[in-house]
Curated annotation (Swiss-Prot):
One annotated GO biological process: lipopolysaccharide core region biosynthetic process
Family label: Belongs to the LpxK family.
Listed pathway(s): Glycolipid biosynthesis; lipid IV(A) biosynthesis; lipid IV(A) from (3R)-3-hydroxytetradecanoyl-[acyl-carrier-protein] and UDP-N-acetyl-alpha-D-glucosamine: step 6/6
Function, in words: Transfers the gamma-phosphate of ATP to the 4'-position of a tetraacyldisaccharide 1-phosphate intermediate (termed DS-1-P) to form tetraacyldisaccharide 1,4'-bis-phosphate (lipid IVA).
Keyword Lipid biosynthesis included in the entry's annotation: yes
Molecular function GO labels: ATP binding; tetraacyldisaccharide 4'-kinase activity
Highest rank taxon of the organism: Bacteria
Name of this protein: Tetraacyldisaccharide 4'-kinase
Catalytic activity: a lipid A disaccharide + ATP = a lipid IVA + ADP + H(+)
Keyword entries, A-Z: ATP-binding, Kinase, Lipid A biosynthesis, Lipid biosynthesis, Lipid metabolism, Nucleotide-binding, Transferase
GO (cellular component) term, any one: plasma membrane
NCBIfam families linked to this entry: lpxK (TIGR00682)
Binding positions for ATP per the UniProt entry: 55-62
Length: 328
C-alpha cells in the first residue's frame, strides 16, 4: 500500500499532506539553522564523505558504500565507516564493530559492510561520536565514509554522494509520509555526485547497476551458479524487495515463492525455517544472510551483488577522494 501511495497510484497521499508539510517545514528549518551557523556542526580532523539518499526505501546505497570503500582501499587509502545502525540496539554507544558483533547490536548494514570490506566500522545515533571512536582506535584512518546521514547535519562533510533508484526515482515528489522524500529533489543541485541505480540516468548522473555474483551457502561458504539451485524460495528484507526477486529471475531462477520482508526486520530460526518446505532451497539477500548465518541450515543460500558504475565520472570521483584523503 505504501508503494502505491508514494507513487501516486493511490489517492490516499492527499490525506497525508498536512503531515508532509509539517515534515518539510521542520526538516527545512533544521538544514537552514546549520547553513546559517545558528547550529554548529562538528568537523572531523579528516575528510568525511556522506553516501545518502533523498528518499526512504531501498536505493542501492549500501552497495555504493561497499564499492567506494573497496575502491579507496585498492588505492592504498585507509577508510573508516560510520552509521546510525538502524535495526540494532547496543548496550552503549558508540559501538566499534568486531568479529563478534551481531546485527542485533549494530544493525544489518554495518555488519555487512564490516564483513565485506574489513574496514573499521562504528555505529552511533550521534555520528560524530562514531567518528571519534574510530580515530581513537585507528588513528591511521585517512577518510571517513558515512553510510546514510545526508540529513544528519550535525556532522560536517566534505563530499556528498546521493544514491537514487533510477526506476522509482522520487515517486509523487512529496515529503514523508505522503511521499517518499526526506528532502526535495532540488537538493541534488548542492551534492557532489548523483549515482542512479538502474533505469535511465539523466544528464550529470552516474549510471550504476547491481551485478549478482555466485550464490553462497550460509553454512559452508560453497559457491555455485544460482540458476543451479532448485525449488527456490526467495526472501528479501531490504528497502525494495521486488528488485531482488527481479535479479533472481534475470539470473534464470523462477522462485516457487517470493517473500518480501520489512527492511531491517529481525530474523530468527523458527520464522525463517517455516518459510521453506522439505526439498526447497532458501535464497536470500546478503543483508539477510548476516542476520541468519548463526542459525542457518544446509539449504540456505544468499546472492551477493556488487555495484558497477559506468562512464568517466567514477574515476574522477575516486581521484578527488584519494586526493582529499592523502591531504593534497
Amino acid at each position: 500500500m505504501i508503494e502505491k501511495i508514494w507513487s501516486g497510484e493511490s489517492p490516499l497521499w492527499r490525506l497525508l499532506l498536512p503531515l508532509s508539510w509539517l515534515y518539510g517545514l521542520v526538516s527545512g528549518a533544521i538544514r537552514l539553522c546549520y547553513k546559517l551557523k545558528l547550529k554548529r556542526a562538528w568537523r572531523a580532523p579528516i575528510p568525511v564523505v556522506v553516501v545518502g539518499n533523498l528518499t526512504a526505501g531501498g536505493n542501492g546505497k549500501t552497495p555504493v558504500v561497499v564499492w567506494l570503500v573497496e575502491q579507496l582501499q585498492q588505492r592504498g587509502i585507509r577508510v573508516g565507516v560510520v552509521s546510525r545502525g538502524y535495526g540494532g540496539k547496543a548496550e552503549s554507544y558508540p559501538l566499534l564493530l568486531s568479529a563478534d558483533t551481531t546485527t542485533a547490536q549494530a544493525g544489518d548494514e554495518p555488519v555487512l559492510i564490516y564483513q565485506r570490506t574489513g574496514a573499521p566500522v562504528a555505529v552511533s545515533p550521534v555520528r560524530s561520536d562514531a567518528v571519534k571512536a574510530i580515530l581513537a582506535q585507528h588513528p591511521d584512518v585517512q577518510i571517513i565514509v558515512t553510510d546514510d546521514g545526508l540529513q544528519h547535519y550535525r556532522l560536517a562533510r566534505d563530499v556528498e554522494i546521493v544514491a537514487i533508484d533510477g526506476v522509482r526515482r522520487f515517486g509523487n515528489g512529496w515529503w514523508l509520509p505522503a511521499g517518499p522524500m526526506r528532502e526535495r529533489a532540488g537538493r541534488l543541485k548542492s551534492v557532489d555526485a548523483v549515482i542512479v541505480n538502474g533505469g535511465v540516468p539523466r544528464s550529470g548522473e552516474i549510471p550504476m547497476h547491481l551485478l549478482p555474483g555466485q550464490a553462497v551457502n550460509l553454512r559452508t561458504g560453497t559457491r555455485c551458479d544460482v540458476a543451479q539451485l532448485e525449488h527456490v524460495v526467495a526472501i528479501a528484507g531490504i528497502g525494495h524487495p521486488p528488485r531482488f526477486f527481479a535479479t533472481l529471475k534475470m539470473c534464470g531462477v523462477q522462485p516457487e515463492k517470493c517473500v518480501p520482508l520489512a527492511d531491517h526486520q529481525s530474523l530468527n530460526h523458527a520464522d525463517v525455517s517455516a518459510l521453506v518446505s522439505a526439498g526447497q532451497t532458501l535464497v536470500m539477500t546478503e543483508k539477510d544472510a548476516v542476520k541468519c548465518r548463526a542459525f542457518a541450515e544446509e539449504n540456505w543460500w544468499y546472492l551477493p551483488v556488487d555495484a558497477q558504475l559506468s562512464g568517466d565520472e567514477p574515476a574522477k570521483l575516486l581521484a578527488q577522494l584519494t586526493s582529499l584523503a592523502s591531504g593534497h
